[in-house]
Amino acid sequence: MALASVLQRPMPVNQHGFFGLGGGADLLDLGPGSPGDGLSLAAPSWGVPEEPRIEMLHGTTTLAFKFLHGVIVAADSRATAGAYIASQTVKKVIEINPYLLGTMAGGAADCSFWERLLARQCRIYELRNKERISVAAASKLLANMVYQYKGMGLSMGTMICGWDKRGPGLYYVDSEGNRISGTAFSVGSGSVYAYGVMDRGYSYDLKVEEAYDLARRAIYQATYRDAYSGGAVNLYHVREDGWIRVSSDNVADLHDKYSSVSVP
């Protein structure tokens, strides 16, 4: 038998007792050249995989929009793992600093890690430059950091919201390194329902209470139609003097308020 035919021999797939584990253990096919196959002397390649190995199952609804009096940020509080509801009290709005907020959509670990890292980098910027980092610079910093890991399985779609000397700022950043400036965004499995409410009721000159009501109604509508969103509506308002947490309303209470009210 030629040496080439030995080296190119396919790996056995799902054979019982493979690698001496016994007991009917089934192992995944790791592919030729994988560690432990006893055939390849070369080091395994740790590059970008040809196909994803883990299917990320997640769902959420987050939104943010700019208006005359700042930026409104709202999110639901349900965490899911496939069809399993893991928690109803997850905080999906991350407080980066007193003037910056970030939202979580995608993998909770990815969002939490990268936005905590962003908070640290923003603080270092302030200490070095003796001034607050701008919303544009913070969002660009996050986009540059995650772009280095493009294609490696990160799952993150976040909005960076804040107020700087240019006024209110809102940017969408995702794990592919995309960065978009805009006036209104919604991210997550329930975003299609939230957009419908926002598109109907949004205007830049909304009064403060009208903006609060619009955000609550948009998240409520998403939780009503999307099984992966629910829990409570956490509402924040970014103003010139910093952000404030406005309210946290259970969607069951909002159902009593909005179920019989038509969208204007």
Swiss-Prot record:
Gene3D superfamilies: Glutamine Phosphoribosylpyrophosphate, subunit 1, domain 1. It is an enzyme of class 3 (hydrolase). It catalyses: Cleavage of peptide bonds with very broad specificity. It is found in: Cytoplasm; Nucleus. It comes from the Eukaryota. Pfam families: Proteasome. InterPro entries: Ntn_hydrolases_N, Pept_T1A_subB, Proteasome_bsu_CS, Proteasome_sua/b, Proteasome_suB-type. The keyword Cytoplasm applies. Induction: Up-regulated in embryonic fibroblasts and neuroblastoma cells by antioxidants through the Nrf2-ARE pathway (at protein level). Up-regulated by the antioxidant dithiolethione (D3T) in liver, small intestine and brain (at protein level). Down-regulated under lithium treatment. Component of the 20S core proteasome complex involved in the proteolytic degradation of most intracellular proteins. This complex plays numerous essential roles within the cell by associating with different regulatory particles. Associated with two 19S regulatory particles, forms the 26S proteasome and thus participates in the ATP-dependent degradation of ubiquitinated proteins. Belongs to the peptidase T1B family. This is Proteasome subunit beta type-5. It comes from Mus musculus (Mouse).
